[in-house]
Amino acid sequence: MEAKPLASSSSEPNMISPSSNIKPKLKDEDYMELVCENGQILAKIRRPKNNGSFQKQRRQSLLDLYETEYSEGFKKNIKILGDTQVVPVSQSKPQQDKETNEQMNNNKKKLKSSKIEFERNVSKSNKCVESSTLIDVSAKGPKNVEVTTAPPDEQSAAVGRSTELYFASSSKFSRGTSRDLSCCSLKRKYGDIEEEESTYLSNNSDDESDDAKTQVHARTRKPVTKRKRSTEVHKLYERKRRDEFNKKMRALQDLLPNCYKDDKASLLDEAIKYMRTLQLQVQMMSMGNGLIRPPTMLPMGHYSPMGLGMHMGAAATPTSIPQFLPMNVQATGFPGMNNAPPQMLSFLNHPSGLIPNTPIFSPLENCSQPFVVPSCVSQTQATSFTQFPKSASASNLEDAMQYRGSNGFSYYRSPN
């Protein structure tokens, strides 16, 4: 074959534009050359002339050539195939439709006839069974009637009917009262069975609901009962505590003289003031009698501080005095007098207001009364006690010597 040289667009004047309507076909004698111009691929055909030279012609693009060459042949083939297929199908379609319709109708008719025959056979068999069972029931007795209480088959036409028809057919064959009674008993038994089932179901549902309620209550009652019990126990404990506290407050009110206050705070204030006055009185009386005691704790439960020899009416009871009282006596003055309020010292000027039947008392004056031995000390030990002279003063008291009695307590006597 001859080589296919590429020619430029400027050297070929006989060019056919792509938009031209000329669409010549290729033949075996022709030669084709592909040329690319402006982004399009063009085909160039060379035909031999009479003198042996080739005539150059331009054609359209390859797509146009493909469409022109193969579209016409494809259309012809489609027409041929369509003609060959459509003609026999158009002739055979109505015949096939008729045949299929006839076959469907025949099948439907056969199915209907078979269904009708089947239903008839089933109904006949059911009637025969019912009649035979009823005859057997009348002969044997009502005990075997429970076997025939089953409803008819699901495939029969009598499924939708009630049990009345089931027993009505049997009444035709009955010739005596025994058969009628058996039918009635069957109806009653069937109804009783239904009622029992319904009641059983209802009872089950009620039981389930009751169980659920009891479970819910059992779960919710436990914390409630615990809370109630705890609150009740707490209330009882509080009541007991209040009763004991009230009893103690009443006892304290009875101990305080001329105290008619019911308020707890005021009652405690009065008790505090009364105890302070008693402490000061004990200290003053001990200094007046010349008994200078060291800073120790002395037992004061068995005797009153008022009965120390000043002929003062003892108004305080032994129970009103505490068991131990601190007696920090100093030589320069009375203990606690500097910090004492003026209300506590009012008994010096008016002691009869606090304790009745008590004369005015001055601690530093001469004591002419004899010393009274406390009740807790025996008479054998009382001989060891001595009495201060009438001219006892503060200097003599400071120079006094300590004397220990046989009872273990420390007392003082004059150097004479």
UniProtKB/Swiss-Prot annotation:
Where in or outside the cell is it found? Nucleus
**Disordered: where is this region?**
1-24, 89-113, 197-231
Coiled-coil positions: 95-124
Where does the record place the bHLH domain? 229-278
InterPro entries, per database record: bHLH_dom, HLH_DNA-bd_sf, PIF1-like_bHLH, PIF3-like
> What GO terms fall under cellular component here?
nucleus
Q: Which domain of life is it from?
A: Eukaryota
| Composition-biased stretches (Low complexity) | 8-22
Q: In which tissues is it expressed?
A: Mainly expressed in stems, fruits and flowers and, to a lower extent, in leaves, seedlings and roots. Accumulates in etiolated seedlings.
Listed under GO biological process in this entry are: callus formation; red or far-red light signaling pathway; regulation of DNA-templated transcription; shade avoidance
Q: Which SUPFAM superfamilies match?
A: HLH, helix-loop-helix DNA-binding domain
Q: What does this protein do?
A: Transcription factor. Involved in responses to transient and long-term shade. Required for the light-mediated inhibition of hypocotyl elongation. Necessary for rapid light-induced expression of the photomorphogenesis- and circadian-related gene APRR9. Seems to play a role in multiple PHYB responses, such as flowering transition and petiole elongation.
Subunit and partners? Homodimer. Interacts with APRR1/TOC1. Associates to PTAC12/HMR/PAP5 which acts as a transcriptional coactivator.
> Which PANTHER family has this protein been placed in?
TRANSCRIPTION FACTOR PIF3 (PTHR46807:SF1)
Q: What is this protein called?
A: Transcription factor PIL1
The species this protein belongs to is Arabidopsis thaliana
Supply the source organism's classification.
Eukaryota, Viridiplantae, Streptophyta, Embryophyta, Tracheophyta
Which gene is annotated as encoding this protein in its UniProt record? PIL1
